[in-house]
């Protein structure tokens, strides 16, 4: 048995959905432990493109239990829309389970999120406007609505009365918006609760039951390390903890249950929204990476900012998450570039540093120090074994592995499941006998 956490090692959008889908074949249970509909992942199966925001990738495997954990925030409208889409595509959803203690994104959360972002103007954070931050804020202030509250009308009414009065006052007085009608909100969310009720479970109990039965459990993170509320590029971060430690809190398990942590990183770097990005490119190279890599957000449709691979944040992700190995995605996007640059350090106020600065203002002043590697300028899309890769592509991967001081277990060369090279079984294989110099 092996219990594995999969995390993003950059700013999100690393291709975790595909890697989780690949690893789900060996998993009995897949747990989404944080985030909400602000995250999105795209999976391609037999040429069919499926875009999901809340439902774990493992839903495509009929014998796999997919659990949305207590650390997530759930928008029932989006979740039910995804379930309907899966049913229409002939996918069995009977294995889906939803934590009774997960918090619920209410209509006022979305309205306030969008209004606050507009009010920030040039100081905007770049939120998705889906209400994630306000939902987590209410959770911290102990005034949130949980999934279990949607199953009982009186409990929902009691829980909602105070918060809705407060939110309506904000909407009207501060933002000049119309108030929400309590009876309409209650009726709408009770209807959601009725549809979700068959899937609602005690999250921690379900996971520990699987662990006692020696099941393989895969914990799926959303977003990425540099968007972590505590360890990312604050304030340009999400409102939860995508790092591996967040799996324990968001799923209700202890750290001794985790056997291995796998990081996912693109062969280059992207970021969506605002915030510092030292290796960001402009001009034709940025356009090439964006167009060739299809760098448009699953959730927002926004064009992602693109840049060279940043080994400084890569090493930071290894340390913060305790990575055992790495999956490198979108190597094929670099196929046509003649010279590749990799950031190995920063120049900050005239000094060379090799660590990620905790101060966002200092990070914004960092200039990348690059090493240049030759490109391979031929297609890798059809490579299925490590030895099929061009030597220069192999050299690039070895350089990344050495720079980050972590072995590479998986190389992804496209969106489809079969466009993957598994160097070593990342779950059951030896922890350090993978691709390195």
Swiss-Prot record:
Pathway: Purine metabolism; AMP biosynthesis via de novo pathway; AMP from IMP: step 1/2
Molecular functions per Gene Ontology: adenylosuccinate synthase activity; GTP binding; magnesium ion binding
HAMAP family noted in UniProt: Adenylosucc_synth (MF_00011)
Catalytic activity: IMP + L-aspartate + GTP = N(6)-(1,2-dicarboxyethyl)-AMP + GDP + phosphate + 2 H(+)
Name of the featured protein: Adenylosuccinate synthetase
Binding of GTP, residues: 12-18, 40-42, 304, 330-332, 412-414
Region (Disordered): 119-138
SMART domains, A to Z: Adenylsucc_synt (SM00788)
Enzyme Commission number: 6.3.4.4
Cofactor binding note from Swiss-Prot or TrEMBL: Binds 1 Mg(2+) ion per subunit.
Binding sites annotated in the UniProt record for Mg(2+): 13, 40
Residue positions binding substrate: 298-304
Quaternary structure note: Homodimer.
Cofactors required: Mg(2+)
Superkingdom of the source species: Bacteria
A GO BP entry: IMP metabolic process
